[in-house]
Amino acid sequence: MCKIFGHNIKLTILLKANRSMVDNTRKLVYGSSIFGKFMSNLNTKFQFRLLSFYNDKKIIDLIKIVKKEVDFAFFPIEAYHVYSIAKSQSKLDGDMAEVGVYQGGSAKLIAEVKNGKELHLFDTFEGLPKVSERDTHFGTSYWKTGEFSNTSLEKVKNYLSNYKNIFCYKGKFPDTSEPIKNKKFSFVHLDVDLFQSTIDCLEFFYPRMINGGVILTHDYHTDGVKQAFNEFCKDKKIPQIQLLGSQCIITKLE
């Protein structure tokens, strides 16, 4: 009992240290400091070590492979959240979707565990749409219109070509949503960075989530994304659960 208790205390300390490290690292990285990049690499190594406490080596290896194959700006724990939540939701009815695919890193993690479900992927494949005054990091502007344009529909299709039931759509969401307007979803992943894009996704997908369906977002620490979730969830009284790193989940409960 003492051994288990001691191990749990050790893990709790590691988790709290990691949360603080993530927050400070992001502030430094967004400031484009050399020290920030150093801290980012250090944090990545720390998180892989933390994940190895309870997870199969093949999961850790998969995340490492994805980070080598494509530009994938997720910390390891954030990548694991995408993988593990998608895996859990694959046992429920409903399809899966992602808006904000970029080069396909998180889509590959979802594809690995979707259990034959359809995965619908949406992106402009031309970078971010118009950035507004709400789209700040810690109160200062950072994103630029057209950022993350280093991708293409063809590259993502080729990257995910070994997986079945993958459907890709090019254009600004929800303008491209017509093919899925009558579908239901068990899992939706958002990585759209901006306030208006987040609102558009929530308004489209939340009514189409099954009972128990989960929407997971990246960049919840940014002002625009967090404000979008707060505004959308307030009147509907939807609980928001912030995860380690920059993620948040909401669940459809009827």
Task: Walk through the language-model features, giving the residues of each.
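Membrane-proximal basic amphipathic "stem/tether" segments
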Residues: 1-70
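S-adenosylmethionine/decaboxylated-SAM
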Residues: 48, 57-72, 83, 91-254
